[in-house]
């Protein structure tokens, strides 16, 4: 039944922060299997199961992925997962049926369905890992060169690497902490979207001051940027503008 007194999962989720420094202690096969099985148990749209996970254990492959990512924790971790949007298995089914299905999985809707499925799988794994005492960090940096990652991992047509995740025991001197999130009132809208510009800007201004104080406190004043400044710096960049081309090369997003 419903237990309104149980806050365990809520508190676990609220404690999340990215861990970028791990002990030199690999995850056991049993732990890896449990994490993957937890991921598989996530909701999946129309039972399509459009995700695959690659567990990268070979140091040479890790090193090659680090070249793409530029981040040391692609190599220095307890385990490395790469999450793949995968319609390859569906293309195999497609060979024996009429009418063919590729119109669906080559479409924008197919991309959205697959990406959402993969994200749900990964978050189940993240929560299960943190419940076991491990830390995690997502690796969107693998999209710096999707073509190279597909080559390194020998991905077939209709299989597209979305991101990675490093998992491991946090190092003794790992000192990350949860970053303040946008206010509840700013992201939760009842019944209809609140697009009142004055209210939205007022909330953002207050949040910017909160984020700036967070950085000042953590760095003894070395950093003081606001969230808006970070967003503007990131989104004004011109990174990864070849993504549509890369999706097309994988057989996706053609319609």
Residues covered by each model-derived region:
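Acidic, surface-exposed loops and disordered segments
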Residues: 1-255
């Amino acid at each position: 039944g419903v237990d309104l007194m149980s806050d365990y999962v809520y508190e676990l989720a609220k404690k999340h922060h990215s861990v970028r420094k791990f002990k030199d202690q690999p995850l056991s096969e049993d732990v890896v299997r449990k994490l993957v099985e937890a991921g598989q148990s996530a909701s999946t749209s129309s039972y399509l199961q459009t995700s695959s996970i690659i567990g990268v254990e070979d140091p040479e492959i890790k090193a090659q992925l680090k070249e793409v990512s530029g981040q040391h924790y692609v190599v220095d971790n307890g385990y490395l997962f790469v999450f793949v949007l995968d319609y390859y298995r569906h293309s195999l089914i497609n060979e024996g049926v009429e009418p063919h299905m590729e119109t669906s999985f080559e479409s924008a809707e197919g991309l959205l369905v697959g990406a959402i499925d993969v994200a749900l799988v990964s978050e189940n794994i993240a929560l299960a890992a943190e419940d076991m005492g491990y830390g995690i960090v997502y690796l969107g940096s693998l999209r710096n060169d999707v073509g190279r990652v597909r080559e390194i991992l020998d991905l077939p047509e209709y299989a597209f690497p979305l991101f990675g995740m490093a998992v491991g025991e946090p190092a003794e001197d790992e000192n990350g902490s949860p970053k303040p999130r946008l206010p509840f009132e700013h992201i939760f809208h009842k019944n209809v979207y609140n697009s009142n510009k004055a209210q939205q800007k007022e909330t953002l201004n207050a949040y910017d001051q909160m984020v700036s104080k967070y950085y000042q406190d953590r760095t003894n004043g070395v950093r003081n940027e606001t969230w808006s400044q970070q967003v503007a710096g990131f989104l004004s960049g011109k990174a990864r503008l070849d993504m549509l081309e890369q999706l097309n090369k994988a057989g996706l997003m053609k319609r």
